Amino acid sequence: METRSKPQLLVFLTLFSVLFSQTLAWPLFGAPSALRMGDRIPFEGANEPDQVSLKADTDILQDALAENDTPYYDVSRNVRHADGVFTSDYSRLLGQLSAKKYLESLIGKRVSNSISEDQGPIKRHSDAVFTDNYTRLRKQMAVKKYLNSILNGKRSSEGESPDFLEELEK
C-alpha cells in the first residue's frame, strides 16, 4: 500500500505547490493585469507616514540628479516606448498605403472606365487578323481563277492576266 501512496503523495504535493505558487503570484481579489507599475496596492502595514518618507527619498534622489546634471536616462522610458510604438505603427501604415496604391494601379490598368478605350487593342488585333485572312483568301481566289482560265483554254491575250496581277496586289 505504501508503493501506491508514494505516487499519490507526489501528485498531491505537485498540485499543492502549483496552487500555492499561483496564489502567491496573483492576489485573490484581482486579475494579473490589474497589477501594474502605476496601480500598486500598498502592503497592509503601509500607512501614510511611510508614503511621505518614500516621497522624500525620491525627492532627494531627483535633487541629487539635478545637481549633478547627469541623469541616467536622457529621455524617460515611457516616452521612448511611445515613440517606438508610434514609429512601428506609422511604418506599418505607410506599407499598407503603398500596397493599396500599387494594387489600385494594377486594377486600374486592367479595368478602364470607358469601353471603347478598353477594347482598342483587342479591336485592332482582330481587324489585323481579319485583314490578313481576307487578303490570303483573295490571293487564293485569284490563283484559282487564273488556273481555271488556263485550264479552260483562255489565253493572256484575252485580258485575264492584268486582272490576275491586280488581284494578287490587293
From Swiss-Prot:
Entry-linked Gene3D superfamilies: 6.10.250.590
Residue runs in coiled coils: none
Signal peptide limits: 1-25
Keyword Signal: yes
GO cellular component entries: extracellular space; neuron projection
Biological processes annotated in GO: adenylate cyclase-activating G protein-coupled receptor signaling pathway; epinephrine secretion; mRNA stabilization; positive regulation of protein catabolic process; prolactin secretion; regulation of protein localization
Keyword Lipid metabolism (UniProt): no
Localisation: Secreted
Positions annotated as propeptide: 26-79, 111-122, 156-170
Modification Isoleucine amide, positions: I107
Sites bearing Phosphoserine, chain numbering: S76
Disulfide bonds: none
GO molecular function: hormone activity; neuropeptide hormone activity; peptide hormone receptor binding; type 1 vasoactive intestinal polypeptide receptor binding; type 2 vasoactive intestinal polypeptide receptor binding
Sorted UniProt keywords: Amidation, Cleavage on pair of basic residues, Hormone, Phosphoprotein, Secreted, Signal
Family in the record: Belongs to the glucagon family.
Extra facts: X's at positions 28 to 44 were included by homology with the human precursor sequence.
Protein name, entry field: VIP peptides
